A protein has these predicted regions:
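Active-site-proximal, glycine-rich beta->alpha crossover segments in alpha/beta enzymes
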Residues: 81-179
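Active-site-proximal loop/short-helix segments
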Residues: 72-74, 81, 135-157, 186-211
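Alpha/beta enzyme core
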Residues: 170-190, 217-219
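Residue-level preference for long, well-ordered alpha-helices that form the structural scaffold
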Residues: 3, 38, 42-49, 109-116, ...
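A short glycine-rich, hydrophobically flanked beta-strand micro-motif that places a catalytic Asp/Glu
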Residues: 188-197, 230-241
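N-terminal basic, low-complexity leaders that serve as flexible interaction/assembly modules and, when applicable
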Residues: 1-84, 209-231, 243-301
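Alpha-helix-loop-beta-strand connector modules within alpha/beta enzyme cores
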Residues: 93-94, 115-132, 205-229
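Conserved, mostly hydrophobic/aromatic
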Residues: 57, 127, 176, 183, ...
Length: 301
C-alpha cells in the first residue's frame, strides 16, 4: 500500500492543474545567456536549442540532454501557435485554433522540414554529434488535443462521444509514432511520452479504462513499433493511470543504489533489452538522486 501511495503521489506531482500541460523542460534567460544564444531562439532554432539543452544539462549535472522546451511542437503542425508571454517569457499557446473536435480536419503526416519540429530534430542531431544522450519528450494524444481545442471540449468528447475520441486518437497516435521514429533516426537515445492532461482521478475508472486508457495504450504501442530498440519512458501521471485501470502491469527492476534517475534510464536502456517500456518516474527528475534503487518496467495488457 505504501508503494502504491508513493506512485500516485509522484503522478500527482507530475500532473498539471492548468488548462494546458506544463513545459517539458524549464529554460531561462540565464541559461540562454550562458549558452551564448537568444532566449527566443531556444524554441525555434535547432542549434540554439541544442546549446541551451547542453547548458541546462551542465548546470544541473544532468546525464541527459532533454528536449524540447515547448509542449506545442506537434500541435503547431495542426494550427497551434506558440507565443512567448511578454511579462513571464513563458512559452504558451494563447488561442485555440478550433472550437470543437468536429471542426478539426484529419491529422495529416507531420512535416519534419518546417516549424518547431524541424528545429527539435536538428537539435537532436547536433547533440548526438557532440556525444550527448538525448531524451526527447513526446506529447501525448490528449495533451496535443488540448492545445487545439479547450480541455473542456476534450473531456466532453470523452464522455459524450468516445468513438470520435478513439478515431481522432488513433490518427494522432500514428503521427506521434512517425515523429518518434524520425527522432530516433536523428539520434534520440530515450523517448518519453507525457500526457498529464487526462487524469485517472478526473473520470470514472470504467471510462478511463475503456476510452482514455485504450487510446493511450494504442499510442504507446504505435511508438514502440516505430522505435522498438529505444527506451520509452511514460510520465507518472500516464503510467500510474494505466496501472490503476488495469491497462498495464509494473515490475521493479533493480539498479545500482545512489544513481541519478537519468543515469538509471541510460544504464537500463543499454543493458536490459527486455526493459524498453518504463514508467512511474518523471523525466524532470533526471538530475536527481533516486530514493529507491528501482526502475519500473511496464507491460501493457
Amino acid at each position: 500500500m505504501a508503494e502504491e501511495t508513493e506512485k500516485f503521489h509522484i503522478a500527482r506531482e507530475c500532473a498539471s492543474d492548468s488548462d494546458a500541460p506544463p513545459p517539458t523542460c524549464i529554460i531561462s534567460e540565464d541559461i540562454c545567456e550562458a549558452a551564448g544564444i537568444r532566449y527566443e531562439d531556444a524554441f525555434f532554432d535547432g542549434e540554439a536549442m541544442a546549446r541551451a539543452a547542453l547548458a541546462l544539462s551542465r548546470r544541473d549535472h544532468d546525464p541527459l540532454c532533454r528536449l524540447p522546451f515547448s509542449v506545442s511542437v506537434e500541435a503547431e503542425q495542426y494550427g497551434a501557435k506558440l507565443t512567448l508571454n511578454e511579462k513571464t517569457r513563458i512559452p504558451a499557446v494563447k488561442n485555440f485554433p478550433y472550437k470543437r473536435l468536429q471542426d478539426m480536419p484529419a491529422f495529416q503526416p507531420l512535416d519534419f522540414t518546417k516549424g518547431q519540429i524541424s528545429a527539435v530534430l536538428e537539435a537532436v542531431k547536433w547533440l548526438k554529434h557532440h556525444g550527448e544522450t538525448v531524451l526527447l519528450e513526446l506529447e501525448g494524444v490528449f495533451s496535443i488535443l488540448s492545445l487545439l481545442v479547450s480541455s473542456r471540449e476534450v473531456y466532453k468528447a470523452v464522455y459524450r462521444n468516445p468513438g470520435e475520441i478513439k478515431q481522432r486518437g488513433a490518427e494522432l497516435a500514428e503521427r506521434i509514432a512517425e515523429y518518434a521514429g524520425e527522432a530516433v533516426c536523428c539520434g534520440a537515445g530515450i523517448l518519453s511520452y507525457s500526457d498529464a492532461t487526462i487524469s485517472f482521478e478526473l473520470v470514472s475508472p470504467e471510462l478511463y479504462r475503456d476510452v482514455c486508457g485504450e487510446v493511450t495504450v494504442d499510442a504507446v504501442r504505435r511508438v514502440r513499433r516505430a522505435a522498438p530498440h529505444t527506451m520509452l519512458q511514460l510520465c507518472s501521471a500516464t503510467s500510474v493511470g494505466l496501472e490503476r485501470a488495469d491497462c498495464a502491469v509494473a515490475e521493479k527492476v533493480p539498479v545500482t543504489p545512489g544513481l541519478l534517475y537519468g543515469e538509471a534510464l541510460k544504464l537500463v536502456g543499454l543493458n536490459r533489452k527486455d526493459c524498453r517500456l518504463v514508467g512511474h518516474g518523471c523525466q524532470v527528475r533526471s538530475p536527481l538522486r533516486m530514493q529507491e534503487p528501482y526502475i519500473y518496467k511496464l507491460t501493457l495488457r
